[in-house]
Amino acid sequence: MTADLEDTRIPVKLKLAALWTSVMFCYLYADYFGLYIPGSLQKMLDGIMEPLGPTTQNMLLGTSLMMAIPSVMIFLSVALRPVPNRWLNIVLGTLYSLIILLTMWSWRFYIFFGVIEIALTGLVVWHAWNWPRASTLKQ
């Protein structure tokens, strides 16, 4: 019965956009659940951005940049031409995998989301690295 199911080839650009979208959802949910860590809201009210320290304009700009890049990659993964698209996804996917690895907190849910985020950004790198060549698509 499963042999009758149709399966269409998903373009690599859409796979990359879907992966970056999934990464963003994981970021958002992990940060949201982080608000439930005891003392977290009080530290926010006191102007402390755990685990980075006192909240400053530069700190907020830096964390905004960290969130904006994956958000923009959702669009760029679809809009850019293949060569710059491929290299940008390889570089940023690798960079974000390393950042996630180096910044995982000890709370289990953060580790859980971190493992998923590393898998997703690893898949970004893998799909970009293995971008189909025009000659293989014609066969």
Task: Go through each PLM region and give its residues.
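Membrane-water interface at the C-terminal end of transmembrane alpha helices
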Residues: 121-139
